[in-house]
Amino acid sequence: MEVFRHGIALCLALTVITPIERLVDVNGVRLRIVEAGPPNGPVVILAHGFPELAYSWRHQIPALAAAGYRVIAPDQRGYGGSSRPEPIDAYDIGQLTGDLVGLLDDAGAERAALIGHDWGAVVAWTTPLLHPDRVAAVAGLSVPPVPRPLTPVTDALRRIFGNSFFYMLYFQQPGVADAEMNADPRRSLQRMLGGMRAPQDEAAALRMLAPGLEGFIDRLPEPDRLPDWLTADDLDHYVAEFSRTGFTGALNWYRNYERNWDITAHPVAETISAPSLFIGGTDDPVLAFTKTDRAREVVVGPYRQVMLDGAGHWIQQERPEQINAELLGFLSQVHWR
């Protein structure tokens, strides 16, 4: 908690914005949130991805709050200071979108702009399908809007990758990836946060897919130094939190693909009419298998795609000034009522 407060405070030291950290009971769980900005400002919810925390938005919170938005950034369920339910089905997309709606209810707001990264982007893109009346705008970072597949994601991945290794399939077996990551949280996080870029050589790419008993972390390159966007204090904060909580809650998000497929079979809205923005990085390995060319099958309202040259997966931490500029420009066009 102390590191968390100090980390956010460092980013806000030159502003008049004072963030508030509090616990909120919503949708059957307790979420730790960081909140900043005027209480009567338009609400913007920042939803982080795997393996991150509300802390991953440390560069966006002050910029958005200073622009007059009421910013709410939760540690999502399974992470950080928030509840970590034991049942795997407690992490399905119905529950995850329900958490964001619960934060809106707690804030007394009818609608919000949802901004998500990685898994948080999946939740952000799904919320206007399940709760269309609560979403004024939606932005996804690193994961674009994609149509519901004909079969569950895991079925498609098994057909595509066969006996090859693929991390999403490896994450399916409860306890396996958990044990690997929990054994050395610092090594796990340093490799995931520091090594998740599009491989520059074919051997590295093939290693990520090679069959065998080797786990996920061992396949990632070990960076010889931290990336420029990640300080030693930043890494220490992530390590402290995941050392305390473990990775099981976070990994349980991946174990609900089949449930999510069922839940999204009959959405309240078939498409997204709210203004939408996707921002990706040209060096993001996730975009090698998550294509951006089917967005218009999902989004029928105003839509814009931005690709940042040379950016990797952790885009809001890597390119904070560019991301902030894009988000502020996008939000300035939103009709909030």
Predicted segment positions?
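Active-site helix-initiating loop/hinge in glycosyltransferases
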Residues: 49, 92, 318-319
